[in-house]
């Protein structure tokens, strides 16, 4: 495998940048409709080829760079440096693993795992969505299918993809799967591998989508719970006292105008609310497992606005007031910008300090990290071994991986505003922000307003 010099690599990227800049400056008024479509097709080819060019870089990083050099996992490093989502970073890493060249333990080069697919991408004949369909096919294909058949199937799908849209390729891949593996994957191991539930991002109206695949055991469990709690008349939020333990009478059933989907939702809420109130979940990161919400005294008194949970979600004040009647949740109030001056001489933060950090930081304070407070630990900005105090004004939240970065060259400090600054080691410092504003979008917007001329 040929190795290029730093100068050759830099020169090639400079030429690529210059060529693209020339294309960006083109004025296409003189082109006819067929010519415009032809130009778009040529640009699409180059867009696809660029993805292939990234594979070698990503695979080399995966093979040679440790987390200390990267400042975290490869997924996190790519997301932060390239300003892409962690999900997109994972997709690129997985694509590079499947389509990029590999090396054996002895150092000799090996072809890509999906050889035909990699070649088609390199020629610009297939794009990201085609590759996604082919990867999904092999993710579902049983390991019992021998190597020769797998290679032939991959070559056929890659060839089919070069002349079809991804959505058309999907139907062909489904038919091929039926021929190669007609009985499907019904083993316990396959079901365990596929299980999962995903809660989507919170939308503008506060609602969140949920999706996933349930094992037969979980489905059977949910069926039993819903048979009771999602029955007509049960757990009806419109009732003054919703029925949970008792069986709804005819009048309760008649009053219930909810759909089955709405009754399912309310049943899950009642079941999880009861579990939280039971106290049987023990503790999580120094606090009883419960809902922690932060808001301002002004918003609470006005019964308007939104609180922010330890998980990073937004809760309307009307919901927050109603939630307070069901369980012993924690509510952290701010009458001003700074939390209470809580401190003590023990190394571990007290429950009260944790609550205030949940409210103040809302999540990991390292720039670029989106871990919410529920998934973060208390970090001493000034090492405890130096001060022997655990002062609320010298504490912050950091997720586990970021907390450990302080042992690998990172430093933390408080600025004049009480915000935590993260200072990377020199080899990772590319001028990135020192403060994490991800959990405080309102501050970002206010800072932009302040920067604009008046």
Curated annotation (Swiss-Prot):
Which cysteines bridge via disulfide bonds? Answer: none
Signal sequence coordinates: none
UniProt GO MF annotations = endonuclease activity; nucleic acid binding; zinc ion binding
Q: Which residues form the HNH domain?
A: 364-405
Q: Name a Pfam family for this protein.
A: DUF222
Q: Which SMART domains match?
A: HNHc (SM00507)
Matches recorded under InterPro entries: DUF222 (IPR003870), HNH (IPR002711), HNH_nuc (IPR003615)
Transmembrane ranges? none
The UniProt family comment states:
Belongs to the Rv1128c/1148c/1588c/1702c/1945/3466 family.
Q: What is this protein called?
A: Uncharacterized protein MT1183
Question: Which species is listed as the source?
Answer: Mycobacterium tuberculosis (strain CDC 1551 / Oshkosh)
Task: Provide the organism lineage as a comma list.
Answer: Bacteria, Bacillati, Actinomycetota, Actinomycetes, Mycobacteriales
């Amino acid at each position: 495998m040929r190795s290029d010099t730093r100068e050759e690599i830099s020169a090639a990227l400079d030429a690529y940048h210059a060529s693209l800049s020339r294309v960006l400056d083109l004025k296409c008024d003189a082109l006819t409709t067929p010519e415009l479509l032809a130009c778009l097709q040529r640009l699409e080819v180059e867009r696809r080829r660029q993805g292939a060019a990234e594979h070698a870089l990503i695979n080399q990083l995966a093979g040679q760079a440790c987390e200390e050099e990267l400042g975290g996992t490869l997924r996190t490093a790519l997301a932060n440096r390239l300003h892409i989502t962690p999900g997109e970073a994972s997709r690129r890493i997985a694509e590079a693993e499947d389509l990029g060249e590999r090396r054996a333990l002895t150092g000799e080069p090996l072809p890509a795992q999906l050889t035909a697919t990699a070649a088609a991408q390199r020629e610009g004949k297939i794009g990201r969505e085609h590759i996604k369909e082919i990867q999904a096919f092999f993710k579902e294909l049983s390991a019992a299918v021998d190597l020769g058949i797998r290679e032939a199937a991959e070559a056929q799908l890659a060839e089919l993809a070069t002349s079809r849209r991804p959505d058309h390729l999907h139907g062909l891949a489904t038919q091929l799967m039926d021929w190669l593996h007609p009985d499907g994957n019904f083993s316990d191991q396959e079901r365990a591998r596929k299980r999962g539930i995903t809660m989507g991002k919170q939308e503008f109206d506060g609602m969140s989508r949920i999706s996933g695949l349930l094992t037969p055991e979980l489905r059977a469990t949910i069926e039993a719970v819903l048979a009771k709690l999602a029955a007509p008349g049960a757990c009806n939020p419109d009732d003054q006292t919703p029925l949970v333990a008792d069986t709804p009478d005819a009048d309760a059933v008649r009053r219930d105008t909810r759909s089955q989907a709405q009754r399912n939702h309310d049943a899950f809420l009642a079941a999880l609310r009861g579990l939280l109130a039971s106290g049987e979940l023990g503790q999580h990161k120094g606090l009883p497992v419960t809902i922690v919400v932060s808001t301002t005294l002004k918003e609470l008194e006005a019964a308007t606005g939104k609180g922010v949970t330890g998980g990073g979600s937004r809760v309307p004040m009307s919901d927050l007031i109603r939630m307070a009647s069901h369980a012993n949740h924690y509510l952290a109030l701010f009458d001003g910008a700074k939390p209470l001056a809580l401190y003590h001489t023990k190394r571990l933060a007290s429950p009260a300090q944790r609550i205030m950090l949940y409210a103040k930081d809302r999540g990991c304070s390292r720039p670029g990290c989106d871990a919410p407070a529920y998934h973060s630990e208390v970090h001493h900005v000034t090492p405890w071994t130096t001060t022997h105090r655990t002062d609320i004004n010298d504490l912050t939240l950091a997720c586990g991986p970021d907390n450990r970065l302080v042992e690998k060259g990172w430093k933390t400090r408080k600025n004049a505003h009480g915000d935590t600054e993260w200072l990377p080691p020199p080899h990772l410092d590319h001028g990135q922000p020192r403060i994490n504003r991800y959990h405080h979008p309102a501050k970002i917007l206010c800072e932009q307003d302040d920067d604009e001329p008046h």
